[in-house]
Amino acid sequence: MILKIQQTKKELFSAAFDILHKEERVGTISVKGKLGSMEADICVNVFGNIITMKYAGGLFAEQKIKKGYKSYRKYSISDATNDGGYIYQVDWQQKLFLTTSYYEMEYKGMYYNSYSVALPAEGGRQSVYREGVQVAQINIPGEVVNNLYNYTIYAIDQKEAEMCAVICAYIYIIAHFKPGEKAIKSYVKYYTIGTKDAFLLEKYNPDFVETIEE
């Protein structure tokens, strides 16, 4: 399944997205934040399933998971039954001067990891794994028009596509959302030398999207 997540609005402390499947709207994402804080209330409505996300980092910026691993920027995830889990960023110190960052999501007993690589001419790629098997890829363009962000999800089925919509909302809030700024007429192209981390590069399969049907 292929889903397109297109930002439609960016106000001072809020943002809105449409979720499209075959050019038809199948859901929305709404973000409500506040000045000077990464805390936000997020609602993902996709195929009629409503998932809410709230900042759950508490007073401490980081939490130690195990030796060499720390988690940051934790958000809770809840559905209509108040059942859900958490999503957060993990920093793994492989060596003294090598730290690898990725996203981890626990949802209803399932564990997802999302690994990012930057491609110099194409933008970002998030390779999404569940229990060690790749189930999706999220493409993030290297060009941003009018401060509005777009994401494309390539997933093996609808369930995994819905989970990736949650991951996209999280990526937006921690990487792209800037409270206090409105969308303005602009064009930005990001340039990067590309990812060098061997661990992250191993997770990226450039042929994965060719296996996905719309």
Language-model features: locations:
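Intrinsically disordered, low-complexity proline/glycine-rich segments
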Residues: 1-214
